[in-house]
Design a protein with these regions (language model features):
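SDR active-site strand-loop-helix element
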Residues: 6, 30, 70-71, 110-116, ...
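Conserved Rossmann-fold NAD(P)-dependent oxidoreductase catalytic core, especially the SDR/UDP-sugar
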Residues: 26-28, 34, 82, 88, ...
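Conserved beta-strand positions in the Rossmann-like core of class I SAM-dependent methyltransferases
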Residues: 4, 28, 47, 160
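N-terminal Rossmann NAD(P)H-binding glycine-rich loop of SDR-like oxidoreductase domains
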Residues: 3-25
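Substrate-positioning beta->alpha
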Residues: 91, 144, 162, 190-200, ...
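NAD(P)H-binding glycine-rich loop region in Rossmannoid oxidoreductase-like domains
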Residues: 35-97, 101-104, 203
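Conserved beta-loop-beta element that borders a ligand/cofactor-binding pocket
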Residues: 149-170
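Glycine/proline-rich active-site loop of Rossmann-fold NAD(P)-dependent oxidoreductases
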Residues: 122, 155, 171-176, 202-211
């Protein structure tokens, strides 16, 4: 089975590629800069371009049966007030093209990374996180994830929008916690490694179709 991974050079996207290779998938990746590709495998086909151009997506999507999207709004640093590097509408414009091209190619399965605090989970998050979302440069990031999920909900795709809590780079394996309606109550952190593994694990599953689980670690 071949999958398209978008956002493959990011901190989570790189781990998605590694996990997909471990699980035996053939992979197409769409990247803006080939020089940022950290992997070398015969199972990875590289396409240069951007998801904000549907023609670039068309070539990269051909022959794939599923899409994993690990796009984000990049900031100058992890500080919530730091300057946005990518355009503030990057995720939603990309997702519009992904949905349109998937329809053209009759591709149905898509898994993407959203965020805890989007949609109905906004009432679940701590006050301090809600304040940061409202008054820092996290605001446009969350606005994009809100729009991304609305676009997916209106589509005919078999989508899953994961809502991870705060991401870290820990390598130690912990128990994954999957929550709906704040049950079980999420913890505050999850490793990018765990997010990447879960994204690949559910490619062939329909258990989370049209759902947005919150994921954390216990």
């Amino acid at each position: 089975m071949k999958i398209l991974i978008i956002g493959a050079t990011g901190r989570t996207g790189r781990l998605v590629v590694e996990e997909a290779l471990k699980q035996g998938y053939d992979i197409n990746v769409l990247v803006r800069d080939r020089n940022k590709i950290p992997f070398n495998s015969k199972s990875v086909q590289v396409y240069q371009g951007t998801p904000t151009r549907q023609t670039d997506l068309a070539a990269a999507m051909r022959g794939c049966e599923a899409i994993i999207c690990a796009l984000g709004i990049v900031r100058a640093s992890d500080a919530p007030w730091s300057k946005l590097i990518t355009p503030p509408n990057f995720i939603s414009e990309s997702m519009k093209n992904v949905i349109a091209e998937a329809g053209q190619q009759n591709l149905k399965r898509l898994i993407t990374v959203s965020a805890w605090g989007v949609g109905e989970t906004k009432k679940e998050i701590p006050f301090w996180l809600r304040w940061l979302i409202n008054y820092t440069n996290l605001r446009p990031v969350y606005a994009e994830h809100e729009l991304e999920e609305k676009l997916l909900s209106a589509s005919s795709l078999r989508w899953t929008a994961l809502r991870p809590v705060a991401l870290n780079d820990a390598k130690k394996k912990k128990t994954l916690k999957i929550s709906f309606n704040n049950f079980p109550k999420p913890s505050l952190q999850i490793s990018r490694q765990s997010v990447a593994k879960f994204m690949v694990d559910i490619v062939k599953s329909d258990k989370y179709d049209m759902k947005s689980p919150t994921i954390s670690e216990s």
